[in-house]
C-alpha cells in the first residue's frame, strides 16, 4: 500500500518517509556541492562553475515535458521535487508509455537521492502504480505539507525549475496541447537561482517553518 507517511521506516510498505536526517546531511556534505548552515541544515547549491545569465530558459505549456520531465531521466545523484498536487503521470517509452514512477524507481536503484514534498495525498491511480515499484519504498523520501504551493525541481543541485506546473499529466506530463494546462516556468543553471530554489525547498523539508505554523490542524503528520 501507499501508506501514511511516518518518521521511521514504514514496515507495511508504501512511500518511504524521510529517513535519518543526519545521514542525508552527511552524504550531501561529502558530495562537496552544498554548504550546511545552522540547525535546520539549510542547503546552498554550489554548481561547479558560474553559468552566464543567458542560461535562463523560459518554458511554457507542452515544453515542460521536453525540458523538465526529460531532464529528470538524466539525474545522477540528487533529485528534489516540490509540488502542490500529484497525480499519475506517464512518460514516453519507445512507441508506448510508462509511469514516471518507473523512471524514479530506476533512479533509486542507481542510488539517486530522491526527495518529494507535496501538499496533499496522491490520487488512487498514482498509489496503485506506486505499489509496483518496491525500490521507491526505500529509495524515495517524502514529506507532506498542506502549505506547499511552490513547484520546484532541483536536478543534482546544479539546475532548477521553478514555475506553475504540478507533478500531473496536465502540468508537467505529456498531455496534448489542446488538453493540458497553460503553464509557465523558468529552468536555469544559474548559481544564485539554483541556490535560492534549493534553500526554499530545504527549509520546508527540515521543518524550519513548523514551530510558528498556524495551520497545524490541517497537518496530519508534522515535519518538525
Predicted ranges, named:
Residues 2, 159-224:
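Signature of lipid phosphatidyltransferase scaffolds
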Residues 2-29, 33:
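Short Lys/Arg-rich cationic patches that frequently serve as NLS/NoLS or arginine-rich RNA/DNA-binding motifs
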Residues 2-4, 32-116, 192:
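PLD-like (HKD) phosphodiesterase/transphosphatidyltransferase domain
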Residues 65, 143-147, 179:
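Short solvent-exposed loop/turn micro-motifs enriched in small/polar/acidic residues
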Residues 85-87, 122, 166-168:
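Short, solvent-exposed loop/turn segments at secondary-structure junctions
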Residues 122-128:
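Short, charged/polar "capping" segments at the starts of alpha-helices
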Residues 130-146:
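Structural recognition of alpha->loop->beta junctions
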Residues 151-154, 186:
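Short beta-strand scaffold segments in enzyme catalytic cores
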Amino acid at each position: 500500500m501507499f501508506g501514511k507517511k511516518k518518521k521511521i521506516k514504514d514496515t507495511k510498505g508504501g512511500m518511504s518517509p524521510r529517513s535519518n536526517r543526519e545521514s542525508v546531511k552527511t552524504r550531501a556534505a561529502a558530495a562537496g556541492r552544498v554548504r550546511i548552515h545552522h540547525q535546520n541544515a539549510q542547503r546552498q547549491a554550489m554548481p561547479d562553475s558560474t553559468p552566464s545569465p543567458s542560461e535562463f530558459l523560459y518554458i511554457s505549456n507542452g515544453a515542460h515535458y521536453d525540458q523538465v520531465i526529460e531532464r529528470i531521466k538524466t539525474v545522477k545523484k540528487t533529485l528534489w521535487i516540490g509540488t502542490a498536487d500529484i497525480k499519475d503521470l506517464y512518460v514516453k517509452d519507445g512507441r508506448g508509455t510508462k509511469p514516471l514512477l518507473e523512471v524514479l524507481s530506476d533512479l533509486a536503484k542507481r542510488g539517486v537521492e530522491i526527495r518529494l514534498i507535496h501538499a496533499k495525498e496522491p490520487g488512487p491511480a498514482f498509489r496503485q502504480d506506486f505499489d509496483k515499484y518496491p525500490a521507491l519504498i526505500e529509495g524515495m523520501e517524502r514529506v507532506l505539507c498542506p502549505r506547499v504551493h511552490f513547484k520546484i525541481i532541483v536536478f543534482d543541485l546544479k539546475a532548477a525549475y521553478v514555475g506553475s506546473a504540478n507533478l500531473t499529466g496536465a502540468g508537467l506530463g505529456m498531455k496534448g496541447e489542446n488538453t493540458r494546462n497553460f503553464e509557465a516556468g523558468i529552468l536555469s543553471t544559474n548559481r544564485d537561482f539554483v541556490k535560492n530554489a534549493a534553500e526554499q525547498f530545504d527549509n520546508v523539508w527540515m521543518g524550519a517553518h513548523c514551530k510558528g505554523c498556524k495551520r497545524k490542524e490541517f497537518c496530519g503528520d508534522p515535519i518538525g
